[in-house]
Each structure stands twice: as structure tokens, then as C-alpha cells.
Design a protein with these regions (language model features):
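Extended hydrophobic-aromatic, low-complexity segments
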Residues: 1, 11-12, 130-131
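Short, solvent-exposed turn/loop segments enriched in Gly/Ser/Thr/Pro and often Arg
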Residues: 2-8, 52-57
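Aromatic- and acidic-residue-enriched carbohydrate-binding clefts of CAZyme catalytic domains
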Residues: 6-33, 78
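Hydrophobic alpha-helix feature that most strongly marks membrane-spanning transmembrane helices
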Residues: 9, 13, 20, 40-47, ...
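Charged, low-complexity, helix-prone segments enriched in Lys/Glu/Asp/Gln
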Residues: 24-28, 62-65, 84, 142-157
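Glycan-recognition surfaces
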Residues: 26-134
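Catalytic cores of secreted or luminal carbohydrate-active enzymes
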Residues: 115-167
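Carbohydrate-binding surface patches
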Residues: 169-188
């Protein structure tokens, strides 16, 4: 994961005159793309994951180098419904990294069932963000079953046609689904 956890607040350079200070953000992006082009050329077998946090690097250009992007450092399942839903307006589910994290969530302290956390993370590039060795046997087996289910439906989820249904209470509800449009699903 290529991360830059830094907020851009100092868009200036001592080396540029005042009338050219507006170039800093653009120069940063050009430099980052150059760096990523070289890295992916030198190491074509490494899957680099980008990160939108800090440097706000989730755009169509960066997808040339990072086929998947960590959409937010916030891993709370309820918060992620909004984050992933909004990203889906501009990006395919296949590039949105989404993880099942521990409960209670370390950021919001919210308790969510494992099934809920999986259901949210499954609408993206699924991962798990906790130590599997720490799980009770029943949860470990549930995670194993979730991964098998995801693998069965991964192509449909990532490459099918994504539909959103607008809800009356848009603040607390998300309703969406994926239709198999010949995406190569081997599921029965």
C-alpha cells in the first residue's frame, strides 16, 4: 500500500515566485505519476495499492498504476457504507479496497456483527484487517465461509452492473446490488 497520510496545507515553494505558487499541487501529481510509472515498470509483478487518505490520491490517473485504492482509513462498517456508496458513483467496485475490521471498531468503538462487516466490505476488493489467529473457532470458520462465498461471486460483484436504489432516509440507508451481465461468474 502506497500511503501518504498527510494533508496538503502548504501548497507553496520557496523556489517559485508568487505568481507560480499555484503549480505545487499539479507538480506533486506529475511527480507521483512519474514515480509510479518507474516503479510499476521495474516491478511489474508487484500489485501496488494506492491510498486516498492524506494525499487524496484516488483519481482516474492513479488507476493506471494502482488498480486498487484504499478508499478511507475509516473501517467502521456503517461509515463505509457511505464512503463506498459515494465512491461507486465515479469508480468501479473492483478498484475500491474494503476490509472487514475488528469489532468494536478501533475508530468509532461501534460493535457490528461479523456478517454485517463482511456484507459491506464484499462490495469492493475484499480484505480482512485483524489477526485471524485471535478469532474464536466459530468466527474463524465464518470468515473462511465468507471468503469462499466472495470468491464464488467476486467477478459478478467487481465487474457486473452496479445499481443503486435511492432510499427515503438517504442519511442512514444504503441499498444497492450487482447484476450479472456476463461478467464470467462461475457461481451456480
Amino acid at each position: 500500500k502506497w500511503d501518504m497520510n498527510r494533508i496538503f496545507s502548504d501548497y507553496y515553494s520557496k523556489n517559485l515566485p508568487p505568481e507560480r505558487q499555484g503549480e505545487m499541487a499539479h507538480r506533486y501529481v506529475c511527480g507521483l505519476y512519474h514515480c509510479m510509472r518507474e516503479l510499476t515498470k521495474r516491478f511489474p509483478d508487484i500489485l501496488f495499492e494506492g491510498c486516498s487518505a492524506g494525499g487524496n490520491r484516488f483519481d482516474l490517473g492513479i488507476l493506471c498504476y494502482f488498480p486498487q485504492i484504499w478508499a478511507s482509513d475509516n473501517t467502521d462498517a456503517l461509515c463505509r457504507t457511505q464512503i463506498q456508496y459515494n465512491y461507486s458513483y465515479g469508480y468501479p467496485l473492483s478498484c475500491i479496497s474494503a476490509h472487514v475490521s475488528a469489532s468494536p471498531n478501533h475508530q468509532t468503538l461501534r460493535n457490528m456483527p461479523l456478517e454485517t462487516r463482511f456484507a459491506v466490505a464484499a462490495f469492493g476488493n475484499l480484505g480482512y484487517e485483524f489477526n485471524l489467529c485471535d478469532l474464536p473457532k466459530d468466527e474463524f470458520m465464518a470468515v473462511k465461509a465468507q471468503i469462499e462465498l466472495y470468491k464464488k461471486w467476486r467477478e459478478v460483484i467487481q465487474y457486473g452492473t452496479f445499481y443503486r436504489r435511492e432510499c427515503f432516509d438517504n442519511r442512514n440507508s444504503r441499498n444497492h446490488g450487482v447484476l450479472n451481465n456476463g461478467a464470467g461468474n462461475n457461481a451456480s
